[in-house]
């Protein structure tokens, strides 16, 4: 049993995944500006409050960092504070408190500059096309540095398109390509549980795509299978509650 802190636990991804480690006997501590009435116990804390993050990180075995501005937005007004400073606060609190494992939410938008029908492997590299994706490239770089320099075990999860609302699901459906990078709520929960439970040696850093099945698969599933023993079960529109 592990103690697992989840930042952004009341957000779209957080609400989809927090139940799974609880069901498997882990102790989950939610951390979100919104007070979540679910079992994860988010209490209105903000990742921009370093002291609050530091206090919450004490005694944790794993931190899943989801809290962020979740879409493209004005870089100076909307993205820098949560996606850059907030990320630093979480990573540095993990270091200060001796949290051995850090799981960082990255994004499929990092490969948006590749052709829309291309099968993308990690070695093909990141090709962001907006500032939101750039903040997630920063997150991957920070995760690698904290693993190498400070000995944390770090997974950067390049998350597929997980619908956060009915409108978001309809946008995915109508996009012409979103179903090929779809990540269901159910598969996301299974993926993050695998991340929590996998044994990793100190100072190890991995980038892993997280997606569901697709008629035309775009994201290489091999790292998730090899590192986590994760295999997707759903295909669009399975595993999401909206449409």
Predicted regions mapped to residue ranges:
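Conserved Rossmann-fold NAD(P)-dependent oxidoreductase catalytic core, especially the SDR/UDP-sugar
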Residues: 89-129
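N-terminal Rossmann NAD(P)H-binding glycine-rich loop of SDR-like oxidoreductase domains
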Residues: 4-23
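Conserved C-terminal active-site "lid" loop/helix of NAD(P)H-dependent oxidoreductases
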Residues: 170-172, 204-231
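Conserved beta-loop-beta element that borders a ligand/cofactor-binding pocket
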Residues: 140-165
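Alpha-helical substrate-binding/gating segment
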Residues: 161-168, 182-204
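Active-site helix of classical SDR
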Residues: 124, 131-138
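NAD(P)H-binding glycine-rich loop region in Rossmannoid oxidoreductase-like domains
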Residues: 47-82
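Short alpha-helix in the Rossmann-fold core of NAD(P)-dependent oxidoreductases
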Residues: 82-87, 91, 103, 135-136, ...
């Amino acid at each position: 049993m592990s103690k697992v802190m989840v930042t952004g636990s009341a957000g779209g991804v957080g609400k989809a995944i927090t139940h799974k480690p609880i069901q498997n006997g882990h102790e989950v501590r939610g951390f979100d500006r919104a007070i979540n009435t679910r079992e994860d116990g988010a209490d209105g804390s903000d990742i921009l409050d370093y002291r609050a993050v530091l206090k919450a990180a004490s005694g944790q075995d794993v931190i899943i960092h989801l809290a962020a501005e979740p879409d493209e937005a004005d870089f100076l007004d909307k993205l820098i504070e949560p996606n850059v400073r907030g990320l630093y606060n979480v990573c540095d609190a993990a270091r200060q408190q001796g949290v051995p494992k850090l799981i960082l939410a990255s994004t499929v938008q990092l490969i948006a500059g590749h052709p829309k029908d291309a099968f993308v492997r990690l070695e093909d590299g990141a090709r962001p096309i907006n500032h939101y994706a750039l903040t997630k490239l920063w997150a991957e770089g920070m995760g690698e540095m904290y693993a190498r320099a400070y000995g944390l075990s770090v997974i950067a999860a390049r998350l597929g398109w997980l619908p956060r609302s009915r409108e978001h699901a309809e946008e995915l459906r109508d996009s012409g390509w979103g179903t090929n990078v779809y990540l269901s709520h159910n598969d996301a929960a299974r993926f993050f549980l695998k991340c929590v439970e996998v044994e990793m040696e100190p100072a190890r850093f991995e980038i892993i795509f997280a997606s569901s099945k697709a008629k035309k698969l775009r994201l290489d599933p091999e790292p998730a299978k090899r590192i986590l023993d994760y295999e997707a079960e759903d295909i669009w529109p399975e595993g999401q509650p909206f449409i």
